Amino acid sequence: MIRAGIVGGTGYTGVELLRLLLPHPEVELVAITSRAEAGQRVDEHFPNLRGHCNLSYTAPDPAILGTLDVVFFATPHGVAMDSAPKLLAEGVRIIDLGADFRLPDAEVFAQWYGMAHRAPEVLGEACYGLPEYYRTKISEARLIANPGCYPTAVILGLAPLLAEGLLQEDTLIADCKSGVSGAGRSAKVGLILPETADSVSAYGVGGHRHRPEIEAVLSDISGTPLELQFTPHLMPMIRGIHATLYGRLAQPMSDAALQDLFATRYASEPFVDVLPFGSHPATRSVRGANMCLIAVHQPRPGQVVVLSVIDNLVKGAAGQAIQNMNRLFSLAEDAGLMQIALLP
């Protein structure tokens, strides 16, 4: 059994990790930490876990964490970097669901996150945890940077075209919508029901932290530096990300050729489902599942629109982290992740 721990177990991502790890056939969950809730039972905070989790929160203890096989950090940026070097030295594998290791350049990280990177000595070995494109590297890694939720949806939607040089790099637009859970569990006036219900609003239009992450990974996949316009929106729903992705083709392609490109690229991927050409995937179809639904459109010759939807807490966070763990420990990639999406 894989001995696992979670640092930061009171947020939505942390409890989603709990929900998925507790029934995992190859995992023993040993520790879940929270300084604020230390000593309190986990199921007192999350009644959906009653009868499934007997653990209590503890303060982070390096002596305990250092004995584990893998530690998940479901923490804000700036936390994992302080613990990573010591845990790695003790042979612990790390999966960081925060942003500390997603950007390979420490200066770029400082620019977007407003703090100096405090573990530059291990930043260079972090592997970006998108299994559909970095599967082999993930299997050999010690430190996994779990992708952000928006980047997961955008990269999976655009990468097949960019990997083949089929899009004009200066025409890329990502218009994305997210549920409120993507903003975390902390109390914020702008996220309470009277502020979000019956309303849609854009944010981060001048520059969102996920943009450099998306650009870095797509540049790596395409083999050429590229930029895109990324605009996120907050939607009056709890879960889900819907990415509408635009680009102009570098050469003419038929609808059938576009569909075949995506269908072939993702044919063997257990968690990417390419729908029939011209389909309209909905976020409600992936709620609670580690799945990305993709549909391709060509509304006029040369103009491509890709629709990509995920559950931000599962394929956009906890589910993908477990997918990465499965790769790290040579398990079936879909182990513990075959939940069917909830409907309605």
Curated annotation (Swiss-Prot):
GO terms for cellular component: cytoplasm. SMART domains: Semialdhyde_dh. Pathway: Amino-acid biosynthesis; L-arginine biosynthesis; N(2)-acetyl-L-ornithine from L-glutamate: step 3/4. PANTHER family: N-ACETYL-GAMMA-GLUTAMYL-PHOSPHATE REDUCTASE, CHLOROPLASTIC-RELATED, N-ACETYL-GAMMA-GLUTAMYL-PHOSPHATE REDUCTASE, CHLOROPLASTIC-RELATED-RELATED. Its EC number is 1.2.1.38. GO terms for molecular function: N-acetyl-gamma-glutamyl-phosphate reductase activity; NAD binding; NADP+ binding. It is found in: Cytoplasm. GO terms for biological process: L-arginine biosynthetic process. It comes from the Bacteria. Its main location: cytoplasm. This is N-acetyl-gamma-glutamyl-phosphate reductase. It is an enzyme of class 1 (oxidoreductase). It catalyses: N-acetyl-L-glutamate 5-semialdehyde + phosphate + NADP(+) = N-acetyl-L-glutamyl 5-phosphate + NADPH + H(+). Catalyzes the NADPH-dependent reduction of N-acetyl-5-glutamyl phosphate to yield N-acetyl-L-glutamate 5-semialdehyde. The active site is at C149. Belongs to the NAGSA dehydrogenase family. Type 1 subfamily. CDD domains: AGPR_1_C (cd23934), AGPR_1_N (cd17895). Keywords: Amino-acid biosynthesis, Arginine biosynthesis, Cytoplasm, NADP, Oxidoreductase.
